[in-house]
């Protein structure tokens, strides 16, 4: 018997987590909370409009830890980070809500969204429609669907639920087979290419460049993971990739927003934004 990969462990734990949450809060209660939530802020629209101007459309990630790197940021205040990202030029936010592997929390999403005007994606491992409704109830504007976690029937089901509750969908792929499945199953304009292999956690920007020619022009490619310096950004922009999801490079910086500005908008001069506003 083979040893489960990190992704397989995460997905198995996610099914257990959803079962426990259903006992605490019914789907009907979540649906009521979703209907009462603030209106979605237009996650896909914000990215598409920014990328259409050939400007970096940055999804800035709020992530305390990861399975491969451990704690990324000890001084972790989601509201402060969200404000810093907004000042630094982010188009959208991504907030990790997975507890066991990324030290995330639902509250982090709520705190980040309340602190700024940016659209927010719930970054988690979605395996059940319950989680989609839960995301809208938390105030999320978009959800992530990871193709390697889902079969085509479940992927389509989750996307349909997302549409019903007013959420955009970012579908994430890592290889050609996953890309083909995503394009054939979903009509979302947002296609994320994860440069990190979720089974081994190895990273290569070639993943985006290899898959790029196979993606129709009407879809927006979001390159995810491995963007660490200006050379990485310029490599993508030369290939007409303008949407980015970046977390680690920002989380390790003293000021996440200043690092965002330095990496993506150097023409604005010396960054003045900070992680926490001085008194």
Curated annotation (Swiss-Prot):
A Pfam family reported for this protein in Swiss-Prot or TrEMBL: IGPS
EC number: 4.1.1.48
An example Gene Ontology molecular-function term: phosphoribosylanthranilate isomerase activity
GO biological process, one term: L-tryptophan biosynthetic process
Recorded metabolic or biological pathway in which this protein acts: Amino-acid biosynthesis; L-tryptophan biosynthesis; L-tryptophan from chorismate: step 4/5
EC category: lyase
Top-level taxonomic group: Bacteria
UniProt KW Amino-acid biosynthesis keyword: yes
Catalytic activity: 1-(2-carboxyphenylamino)-1-deoxy-D-ribulose 5-phosphate + H(+) = (1S,2R)-1-C-(indol-3-yl)glycerol 3-phosphate + CO2 + H2O
Alphabetized UniProt keyword annotations: Amino-acid biosynthesis, Aromatic amino acid biosynthesis, Decarboxylase, Lyase, Tryptophan biosynthesis
UniProt xrefs under PROSITE patterns: IGPS (PS00614)
NCBIfam families listed in its UniProt record: PRK00278.1-2 (NF001370), PRK00278.1-6 (NF001373), PRK00278.2-4 (NF001377)
HAMAP family tied to this protein: IGPS_B (MF_00134_B)
PANTHER family from the UniProt entry: INDOLE-3-GLYCEROL-PHOSPHATE SYNTHASE (PTHR22854:SF2), TRYPTOPHAN BIOSYNTHESIS PROTEIN (PTHR22854)
Family named by the database record: Belongs to the TrpC family.
Protein name: Indole-3-glycerol phosphate synthase
Record organism: Ectopseudomonas mendocina (strain ymp) (Pseudomonas mendocina)
Organism lineage: Bacteria, Pseudomonadati, Pseudomonadota, Gammaproteobacteria, Pseudomonadales
């Amino acid at each position: 018997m083979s040893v489960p990969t990190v992704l397989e462990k995460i997905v198995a734990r996610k099914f257990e987590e959803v079962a426990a949450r259903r006992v605490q809060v019914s789907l009907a209660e979540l649906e009521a909370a979703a209907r009462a939530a603030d209106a979605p802020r237009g996650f896909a629209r914000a990215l598409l409009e920014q990328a259409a101007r050939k400007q970096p459309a940055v999804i800035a990630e709020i992530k305390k830890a990861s399975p491969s790197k451990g704690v990324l940021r000890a001084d972790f205040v989601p509201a402060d980070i969200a404000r810093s990202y907004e000042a630094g030029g982010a188009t959208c936010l991504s907030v990790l809500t997975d507890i066991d592997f990324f030290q995330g929390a639902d509250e982090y999403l709520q705190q980040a969204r309340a602190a700024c005007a940016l659209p927010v994606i719930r970054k988690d491992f979605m395996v059940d429609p319950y989680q989609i409704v839960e995301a809208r109830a938390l105030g999320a504007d978009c959800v992530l669907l990871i193709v390697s976690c889902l079969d085509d029937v479940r992927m389509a089901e989750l996307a349909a639920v997302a549409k019903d509750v007013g959420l955009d969908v970012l579908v994430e792929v890592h290889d050609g087979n996953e890309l083909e499945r995503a394009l054939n199953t979903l009509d979302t304009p947002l296609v994320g290419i994860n440069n990190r292999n979720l089974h081994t956690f190895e990273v290569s920007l070639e993943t985006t460049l290899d898959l790029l020619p196979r993606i129709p022009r009407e879809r927006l490619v979001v390159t995810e993971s491995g963007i660490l310096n200006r050379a990485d950004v310029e490599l993508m922009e030369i290939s007409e990739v303008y949407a980015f999801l970046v977390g680690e490079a920002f989380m390790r910086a003293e000021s996440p927003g200043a690092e965002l500005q330095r990496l993506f908008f150097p023409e604005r001069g010396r960054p003045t934004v900070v992680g926490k506003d001085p008194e």
